[in-house]
From Swiss-Prot:
It is found in: Cytoplasm. Residues 1-72 form the S1-like domain. Gene3D superfamilies: Nucleic acid-binding proteins. NCBIfam families: infA. PROSITE patterns: S1_IF1_TYPE (PS50832). The keyword Iron does not apply. SMART domains: S1. The modification Phosphotyrosine is found at residue 60. This is Translation initiation factor IF-1. PANTHER family: TRANSLATION INITIATION FACTOR IF-1, CHLOROPLASTIC. It comes from Geobacillus thermodenitrificans (strain NG80-2).
Length: 72
């Protein structure tokens, strides 16, 4: 997936799922299934329910995404 093809949106983590997956509610009300990007996993950044995050969505599958940033 090329970097210029992604759609970046903000959302809130609703629940934590197994295998580092999260259910995220976007600002527009949609719910997506998101996994953690490699840099966040590498630096052991914890993501908990209620955290505000930035999610990258592929234009081909808008139900899945990648968490790229957790706001402080």
């Amino acid at each position: 997936m090329a970097k210029d093809d992604v759609i970046e949106v903000e959302g809130t983590v609703i629940e934590t799922l197994p295998n580092a997956m999260f259910r995220v509610e976007l600002e527009n009300g949609h719910t997506v299934l998101a996994h953690v990007s490699g840099k966040i996993r590498m630096h052991f950044i914890r993501i908990l329910p209620g955290d505000k995050v930035t999610v990258e969505l592929s234009p081909y599958d808008l139900t899945r995404g990648r968490i790229t940033y957790r706001y402080k």
